[in-house]
Each structure stands twice: as structure tokens, then as C-alpha cells.
Design a protein with these regions (language model features):
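Short, hydrophobic-biased segments on the C-terminal half of alpha helices
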Residues: 71-72
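Residues in the helix-turn-helix
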Residues: 66
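Non-DNA-binding regulatory cores of transcription-related proteins
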Residues: 93-164
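Residue cluster at the C-terminal edge of the helix-turn-helix DNA-binding motif
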Residues: 76-79, 107
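Beta-hairpin "wing" of winged helix-turn-helix
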Residues: 78-87, 91-93
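Alpha-helical residues within the helix-turn-helix
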Residues: 58, 75-76
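N-terminal helix-turn-helix DNA-binding core of bacterial DNA-binding proteins
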Residues: 28-30, 34-63
Length: 164
């Protein structure tokens, strides 16, 4: 069992949960990473054709059951069209340049905040009026959101083509 310690900075409430390894990155969940991979995969394909779940799962190395839950989330949010049955599958319903990475990650993550106290819908922190670090965390959140909202699926495809 992994134990998690809280980093406490003097005069500031516990703000960051750190696992025993000091080089732990800020985390985007597996669901978020897989959703992004699937959206990139679909963006590389013909928008008129439906791609079977099994084909996507095999190409991306994701279990069909887990992928089905992700695709349901994407479909309900209007990110993809879904057709069930023979000849069915999934496809993007807009051009790749109309999907931002931020919108995909916000859908799957709920928040891209670096700390819990700045997350959308978080309960007001009792220290927010006297927390010297709060403006810094809020700036970081804005930077993260601006970064991810400034990149589209089309940008990722172009960047990949440029590298090759």
C-alpha cells in the first residue's frame, strides 16, 4: 500500500499531496490520456466513416470495456457521433481544429487545477483571504488552461507530421 504524505508550508494550509517519490509529475488521469489518444486517432481518419470500438481498442492498446466508458463520455458530451450495431462505431462530428485539448481534458478530468483549493466547484478554503500562495496557484491554473485551450487536435497532428 502506498502512503501519501502532505507537504505543509509554514503559515499555509496543507496544499499539495506528494507520494513518497519526490519527482512525481502533475497528473492527468489514465482516462484523460486515453480520451486524448482516441480523439487523435479519430482525427487521423475519414470523418465520414464510423470506426468500430474493437478496432480503436486494438490500435490504441486499451481494453474494450474501459474504452467503452470513455467513448460514452465523449459521445454524451457531443464530441463524437456513435452508431451501434453492424457497421457502427465512432467518429468525430466536427473538424479536428474545433476540438481543444483543454476541452477534452476538462471533460475527462473535471478540473485541470494544480491544487484542490483552486479547482472549479471547490469549497471555499478558510485560508483563502490570508493565503500568500493563492494568487500564484490561480496564475498557474490560468496558464495551464490557456496552454491546453490553445492547442487543437489539428495542431497535434501537424506537430507530429513536422517531427517525422
Amino acid at each position: 500500500m502506498t502512503r501519501t504524505a502532505l507537504l505543509t508550508i509554514p503559515r499555509i494550509s496543507p496544499i499539495v499531496s506528494i507520494a513518497p517519490t519526490a519527482n512525481k509529475p502533475m497528473i492527468v488521469s489514465t482516462k484523460g490520456r486515453y480520451a486524448l489518444r482516441v480523439m487523435v486517432d479519430l482525427a487521423q481518419r475519414d470523418r465520414e466513416e464510423y470506426v468500430p470500438l474493437k478496432e480503436i481498442a486494438e490500435k490504441e492498446g486499451i481494453s474494450q470495456k474501459y474504452l467503452e466508458a470513455i467513448m460514452t463520455t465523449l459521445s454524451k458530451a457531443g464530441f463524437v457521433d456513435a452508431v451501434h450495431g453492424k457497421g457502427g462505431g465512432y467518429r468525430l462530428n466536427r473538424t479536428a481544429d474545433s476540438y481543444t485539448i483543454g476541452s477534452i481534458l476538462m471533460l475527462t478530468e473535471g478540473s485541470l487545477s494544480a491544487v484542490a483549493c483552486t479547482a472549479k466547484g471547490a469549497a471555499a478554503c478558510s485560508r483563502s483571504t490570508c493565503c500568500e500562495a493563492l494568487p500564484m496557484w490561480e496564475r498557474l491554473d490560468r496558464m495551464i488552461n490557456e496552454f491546453f485551450n490553445g492547442i487543437t487536435l489539428a495542431d497535434l497532428l501537424k506537430d507530429r507530421e513536422t517531427e517525422q
